[in-house]
Amino acid sequence: MAKFVIRPATAADCSDILRLIKELAKYEYMEEQVILTEKDLLEDGFGEHPFYHCLVAEVPKEHLTPEGHSIVGFAMYYFTYDPWIGKLLYLEDFFVMSDYRGFGIGSEILKNLSQVAMKCRCSSMHFLVAEWNEPSINFYKRRGASDLSSEEGWRLFKIDKEYLLKMAAEE
């Protein structure tokens, strides 16, 4: 299968993006944590001030999934800023359906993301990978990624909404 297109997502792609987000969450054993809706994706990514950007991988009709889908991969990203090095492209989610891996789709998505990062004068691209996900770790390392957890000793933290509300209400 040599034919596929990587393109910016449109509002019409939201149902496919959500489907792929759920597939990725299932792959990561976190399926029950997806609470996002198609409406959220539409409002958050395609309004006046989008919170995210997205690329999709689309195959022609002769290569549709068994369920009839043409969107077989996606990358969701946004821009952020590091006060030490400047602009960053943060890759939030990146997934290609298992039946479509090995055809260069993931490599082409990453190439497109790299072009976006360079066009926007970003100094690097950051992302998370589950420790157990050796195929993805190897995919990124083959392309020059470095593991900041082991090399620089950083830890990722989060503050859930209930604690944000509590802190926001403090006097």
Swiss-Prot record:
InterPro entries: Acyl_CoA_acyltransferase, Diverse_Substrate_AcTransf, GNAT_dom
Binding site for substrate: Y27, E28, E92, H126, F127, L128, E152
Catalysed conversion reaction: an alkane-alpha,omega-diamine + acetyl-CoA = an N-acetylalkane-alpha,omega-diamine + CoA + H(+); spermidine + acetyl-CoA = N(1)-acetylspermidine + CoA + H(+); spermine + acetyl-CoA = N(1)-acetylspermine + CoA + H(+)
Active site per the UniProt annotation: Y140
Listed EC numbers: 2.3.1.57
A Pfam match: Acetyltransf_1
Molecular-function GO term, any one: diamine N-acetyltransferase activity
Cellular component per GO, a single term: cytosol
Pathway where this protein functions: Amine and polyamine degradation; putrescine degradation; N-acetylputrescine from putrescine: step 1/1
Domain N-acetyltransferase: 4-170
Keywords: Acyltransferase, Cytoplasm, Transferase
Swiss-Prot/TrEMBL GO biological process terms: angiogenesis; polyamine biosynthetic process; putrescine catabolic process; spermidine acetylation
Subunit structure: Homodimer.
PANTHER family assigned: DIAMINE ACETYLTRANSFERASE 1 (PTHR10545:SF36), DIAMINE N-ACETYLTRANSFERASE (PTHR10545)
Family: Belongs to the acetyltransferase family.
Protein known as: Diamine acetyltransferase 1
Organism: Sus scrofa
